[in-house]
Amino acid sequence: MWLSLPRSGYGSVATLTSKRVLACLTPLRQFSTSPAVSNANHKNVDNINKSPANDAANNAVEKGDKPTTSPEKLATKAEKSSANSVKAAANALGESNLSNSEQRRLDWIIMKDMLKYIWPKGKTSVKFRVLVAVALLVGAKLLNVQVPFFFKEIIDDMNIEWNSATALGVGITALIFSYGAARFGAVLFGELRNAIFASVAQKAIKEVATNVFRHLLKLDMAFHLSRQTGGITRAIDRGTKGISFVLSSMVFHIIPIALEISLVCGILSYNFGWKYALVTGATMVSYAIFTITTTSWRTKFRRNANRADNEASNVCLDSLINIEAVKSFGNEGYMVDKYQSALTKYEKASIKIATSLAFLNSGQNLIFSSALTAMMYMTCCGVADGSLTVGDLVLVNQLVFQLSVPLNFLGSVYRDLRQSLLDMGSLFSLQKVAGQIQESPNAKPLQLTNGEIRFENVTYGYHPDRPILKNASFVIPGGLKTAIVGPSGSGKSTILKLAFRFYDTQEGRILIDGQDVREVTLASLRSAIGVVPQDTPLFNDSIMNNIRFGRLEADDKEVENAACAAKLDALVRQLPDGWNTNVGERGMMISGGEKQRLAVARVLLKNSPVVFLDEATSALDTNTERQLLANMDQVLGDKTCVAIAHRLRTVADSDKIICLNQGGVEEEGTQAELLLKDGLYKSMWDAQEQVELGEEGIKEAEEKAAKKDV
């Protein structure tokens, strides 16, 4: 089929996220960011691992009128909309460099948006879980603070002369058991908190991921053809992993850390004086400033790693999706080198992440160790002059180390939180990508009578400076078979995409039974049209399920009948697994002709009143093609059928033939009428006849030679 735009299939995006492809991406996956893993590794682990162009036209168009908005203004609006979408998509894939202030602004927006998952409206069970988790958290912190006091009392009570006759008193024994119970209770409350809150985080992950996936499927073809799917899947993968950490951080880290630091500082100040409060306060301020400043500096390394990760994923995905081409041209080595080059970029960025992490950890440890040394010195002086006891020394030591836990969390949580927010920013940016194809607020379901399709002064081009259709006007009569033919680049397949509203016209309008396609709902429009594309999009699933994709509610018998009409039943009977035979990635385990018959079966099962056939039999042999076309003519009956064809013999029986050339209608009529005109169609027909007659002569000679040999 002649095309002016590289084809990717009418549903190929959905096939790109197969398990086989995603499996190759797992070596680059991040470490888990669940609360349990974060707590275990908080010190040393870093997560290295409504189209504006058409609104004016729609408002201006009345029945029989042309848009009053000039093509130049329409193009300008379309470019602005496209530019905004591209910018949002670039943010989503880590391809744009945000300043620190812009990144912080985005972080706050994300955290504000995540609050609705912690405290959702109308979901009492979720709110109850959050309240219980918070109560367990407070209980754990209070028990944690009690542990050093029990230890101090034990030390002071034990600071006596002991001999073999001395026994532990009831008080000391009770303190020892209280010490153990407090430690165990703090840990138990923490684990119960994690278990109870887990469902809240997982529900949020499911809801966000589903919303993003739904939005991606609603975006127009222009977006999907301009983006690399590998980068999108990685953005979703990283973003969903960050949701759990951000939610748990908001509930279990930020507020609790502030609470614990306040408790420890208050105790030190109350029990030991203002000097301890001064050291503690200076430590807090120094630690926070150093951590925030250093982490902000490190963010660019993480962004570079994400960009390299996306690049590697894209190379891997493209290689596996096009594995046949890779092997056919023997370019395995080239693709490996390309993949390794992307991994090298990821390696360099990851090394910078690791080395900057070492600097961060060292600086944090220096600040904390200095504070610990100062406090221990002051306490030892107090013990020496008798104002403090040995138990007080132990208490200060324990409280300072108690302070180290929230301090370390402050550093690691802020660091990991920034990384998670950076990853989530990509995920949420995908939701802000505005599709160029928008449904009108007043859209109504398409009402079909006879299925007439009318193009009125339609101008469209995939690029503004290269229009494919130029002020084209023609009518596809309802209930009849119409063929669209023409040389390469004349806009044949573009007509299908515009009728289906994969794209919107830049000028003019398209009417189906008198209804502008931009004024009807997308669901009703696309359910009314069935398509057999030249490049058949198949899923890595069974033959039965691939055909049933045309109408999901169809039963097995209906699927089998559609396959029989498409001459596919004979193939199925020969297969060991029959209808359950898997067709492989993009249908690579069956032949091109078999794929086309499967696509025909799918559209026959859909049973839509309008059918487009885009070179639907180009991969079939002559006999199978004739049988299939005869079957389809019988099955389609009085449906509106539009056949886009290169081989003119396959559409010679059409009720009407529209011949396109240079973006407009060159001529139209029946086969006989066009041959009498002696125009473009006649010249194309004669050229093909000469080729086919030559091929038939060669075939006859080969058959005669074979009989002679026998």
Swiss-Prot record:
Residues 130-419 form the ABC transmembrane type-1 domain. One of its GO terms (molecular function) is ATP binding. Residues 453-687 form the ABC transporter domain. Residues 39-129, 198-246, 293-358, 415-710 are mitochondrial matrix. Residues 152-173, 271, 378-392 are mitochondrial intermembrane. Its EC number is 7.-.-.-. It comes from Yarrowia lipolytica (strain CLIB 122 / E 150). Coiled coil: none annotated. This is Iron-sulfur clusters transporter ATM1, mitochondrial. Homodimer. It is an enzyme of class 7 (translocase).
